[in-house]
Amino acid sequence: VSANHEDQVALNIAVNLLNNANGTGYLDKLMVEHKLMGALAINESMNEAGILAVAIMPKLLIQSYSSAEKMVWDEINRVKNGDFSDEMFNSLKLEQKRQYASSLENIDSRATIMMNLFSQGKSWNDYLNEVARIESITKEDVVRVAQKYFSNNYLCVTKSTGKYPKDNLPKPAFSPVVPRNADASSSYAKQLEKIPEQQVAPRIIDFEKDVKTSKLTPLVTLYTTPNPLNDIFTFNISYGIGALEQPELMQLTNYLQLLGTESLPFEQFRS
């Protein structure tokens, strides 16, 4: 569906039930449990139309396309039948709200949002109001859009591995295109040039004042600082050792993403 469509927010949540950033979607679990090499649901909402697609990669040599497709459809039907918990549903709504808030933390993403809003005919208030729309979405809304858009009316494209013949085309004898108005400026560009530039002094981080340092163990130091923009926190772990000295670290980082805790299984911990 398009970015302005009334079903766009609910469809995003339906797709996130299959794949999400936390790796707890139904298709994510197929990969974690090594039932498929890859499975990904995509919902791309553009200005006037949208793309809803599912990409599947069967296990090489030992799995057929039909069996892999059946596995994916079984998981899609779980969403269509409302087979997901309220806890998972509310967690995905919260994740959507977190993404909206975190996208406002830096000027680059804010500029991209403004550009997209302009092309979609929306205002900045429309963007802020979308958070309220997320909160108002119900489980019934998600089931309804899943049944509507994950239908049997779809195009299936299959790609086989191998080598294909290539046609080597000669370089055409075209002359370089010289733009007519390369030196011209629009009225908008001229208006921007008239805006005076402000000298902004860099703000250097002072680790003594801006960062709280806590020595947890002789080998572990915790650095914390408040988020001045919202109540979202980010937790990063950095090891003072390189992969050349200890190559196992490269595998460890991938393994840690699949673990839970002593009291919480993987799905609950990641959600």
Question: What is each stretch, according to the model?
Answer:
Residues N4-H5, A21, I42-A49, E75, ...:
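Scaffold signal of the M16-like zinc-metallopeptidase fold and its non-catalytic homologs
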Residues S2, A21-N22, S45-S103, Q246, ...:
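M16/insulysin-pitrilysin zinc metalloprotease superfamily fold
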Residues N12-A14, L30, V54, V72, ...:
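Buried hydrophobic packing residues in well-ordered domains
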Residues M31-V32, D74-I113, E130-R133, Y154-P165, ...:
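Acidic/histidine-enriched alpha-helical segments
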Residues Q8, T24-G25, L36, N47-I51, ...:
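Extracytoplasmic
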Residues D28, D126-S238:
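Proteolytic maturation boundary segments
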Residues G38-E44, L222-T225:
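Short beta-strand/turn micro-motifs at beta-sheet edges
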Residues N20-K35, E48, N236-S271:
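M16/MPP (pitrilysin/insulinase) zinc-metallopeptidase core fold and M16-derived inactive scaffolds
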